[in-house]
Amino acid sequence: MRRSPSALYFILLFTLYAPFVPAQSPMQLSGRVTDPNNASVSGAVLTLIARDNRLRTTVMTASDGSYRFEHVAAGDYLLEARAAGFAKTVRAVSIKPNGERLDIALDVAAINDNVIVTAAGTAQSVDELSKAVTVIDAQQMEMRGEYSILETLRTAPGLRVTQLGGPGAFGRIQVRGLRSFDTAILVDGLRFRDAADVQGSANGYISELNVVSCERVEVLRGSGSSLYGSHAIGGVVNLVTDQGGGRLRGQAQFEGGSLGLFRERVNVAGGALKDRLFYSAGLSQLNVTDGVDGDDRTRQTSLQGLLGVHFTPNVTLSGRVYANDAFLALNESPANAPGFVAPPPGTLVRAIALDRGEQRRIETRGVPLTPTNYNRGNANFIPDLNDPDNRRNSGFFSGALSFMQRLNNTADYRLSYHRAEADRSFLDGPLGIGSFGEPAFTSIGDFASDIDTFTARVDLRMGGANLLTAGYEFERERYGDFSSDESPNPPSASLGITERSHAFFAQNQTKLFDDRFQLSLAFRLQNFELSSPRFSGGAPRYVGVTFNSPPRAYTGDGSVSYFFKSTNTKLRAHVGNGYRSPSLFERFGASFFFGDFTAFGDPRLKPERSIAVDGGIDQTLLRGRVRLSATYFYTRLQNIIDFGSPPPDDPSNRIFGGFLNFAGGLSRGVELSAQISPGRSTELFASYTYANADQRAPDAAGNLTTPGASAHIFTLVATQRIARRFDITFDLSAVSDYSPSFPSPSFDTRYVFDGYVKADINAGYTLPINDRHSLRFYGKVENALDRTYFESGFRAPGATFTGGMSYRF
């Protein structure tokens, strides 16, 4: 696909100009970090974050506990301090023209504090939040032994995480009982999605987002469309990478275990020239040679990098990349068992899987199933059968350049360019015993997309109470697919289409009463321009159909909170409407069969719209050792897009079905969570979510429940440190019964799958070499209870073991 360098040229112009911007005299922030007994804490990591999120830099304390940030501009910041064996602490600080000093005393027994940037697009402490946000940091990921962002999110409140098989298999995230594509995925605050995905989401790459150089993951539950645009109807997941700065640090890690799993990871970060230059980089390799059925091979190579320069304390240029290359062996989709007689219409069928031994015999024999040529027993569905020559090759690239300048103490601006590319190829040969048969020759389907985004943003501080953010965003997305096979006279077909959009956004954040009162109001207007599709090979579809651009999107968002300092109680409320433009595939998607296109899309589709409300209370007790949270949520999907049967007068003659507009459903429920730190060596976290998620109208089986949603979700994470060097973490997730979208003998039947409990145990031992170097040895048992369960008919791994070591400096 062609690349448009215009935005790059624009930012490079500022790069040439930046060194000549008049520099203010450099400021500094210094101080000392101590423990509760006023003893110095050496090796503590301190991160300074600008309130407008334009700067994030890190230093470490010296042997006497002292620290110093140099070459920083005057202004408002949050300072985050963390050290092994202590609770993470966040302090607000205003750096004045003559510098500032801030001493920090760390607590050994308290709930970790965090700096959050996803809720408002600016840096906030936990006490300042007016929305429901969960943070999982790098230390928690290490204690749990997680290498996948998908598994990291499994214990977050309100989230239902599914993976269709073993490591590297397709995954999904559902927030508060909504659909998986209702969650926006960000990398360092930049939207990450695939324009060639059916819904234009990041679903196809969720399982390829691995822990490479990750600092933390932030999860916003509730509408975020006014800040982050399309696909943020239900929530936002923001993967924040290491921002570099400070002394050189890094890690080298190797692990291996069950399922033929091997993983290697290296990362480094630091700064130079007194932190005028800051950088981070990471490389990860995941290989799975066996998988669940012995032939589920997976390979993933991931790269992350950041390089930036502070020309002056007020002028910064940075660039970042995140890329992945992957291979995944695919199985057949689960299907109903031949010979199973469907019950009367409207009946929910309890899913019963075919015996695993019989499934292996069927796969070895390689003969298509009939009602009489296998031993069905009492099974009514067949889990994913092995398909020896079905595979997917994929890759993505996300790269960004950002230029930021602070004009004075009240105004700054930033310009950024972001490019996201994605390419997926599916190849399926004649082997296997699929329910719909196998191709005579290897079929090839390639789906590629690229998205270019240019953003200009201004932040204005109006007095000490208001921060106004306003900006413009231009986005161009292109989607193309290609279909062929390896026959002697291969057919070929392709489709290409482009869409552009212009968005204007604004947000005002108000803080009053010594920052105890927080009010945020946001608005976004987005306009779309659609080109005509380009078909080649086979007769084109959508002839005579008017190609109208989607209507303008107007979204608003408001949140408010008040913190009662005397009782450490916070009340909060959040309301927002969401919007999702029809994807390019939903409007023009087609499949190529027998030398012709079969249309699935509808160029006339209306966008999806929603309204969401939530409110809650956060209570801190026992001098910060206990934090309780309760949230009620309500989301109504006013208009949705789904697959169905078009009317007889459908202009595109979609005889096999297609995408249509429907009235949406709703989800309402509660989220409860508790964090407890009874002592410096023990941490507990538990959450319970009840989500009553219904469609507007029952399906053919008479079921109202949203496909894939579990009404009850419980999570638990318990960490115990022993003698400072040994730690053990137990994490558990339990979900109730659910009914996914799943093939059935007739459209009048709906399968119900049993809920499950997944428990993991990770233990580690850290061996210090000196003050800055250490070795860590660890082992993890996943699904430690060895439960047999299925995700939408795909068999999950039983009990597995992984062990490894890491060297940290």
What is the predicted function of each stretch?
Residues 269, 308-312, 508, 561-564, ...:
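Conserved C-terminal beta-signal and adjacent last beta-strands/turns
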